Amino acid sequence: GKARLIQNLLAVVDELELALNAAKNTEGAGAVANGLEIVLKKFRDLLSGEGLTTIESVGKKFDPTLHEAVERIQCDDVAEGTILEEVRKGFTLKGKLIRPSIVKIAVPHIPESDDAKPIESGQN
């Protein structure tokens, strides 16, 4: 149905975003980047009009119903479970999850304890 079509269109949006980022980092590709931005905006507007909403992730608390964690990064600057980076955007369609955000989350730094070091037996 409609959800499947939108999921397929999201794959196209992902590819367009990758192409746009590549064009922005390529000297002399300004016109290509501008064209891609226009196409992406039209895609996003069309999908938004159908009820698609981007899930806000970075800086938010990890929610397993909306996010999929692919990496845990030791970080003491933010609360445990805070999303540090979004690898792929997630979306809801009229309030229902259509694609989870793929994210990297903060975990507390674990200091190495003396227990973790090998025990020396004293024998040679």
Q: Predicted regions span which residues?
A:
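Structured alpha/beta interaction-core segments
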Residues: 13-124
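Charge-rich, N-proximal long alpha-helical rod segments
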Residues: 1-11
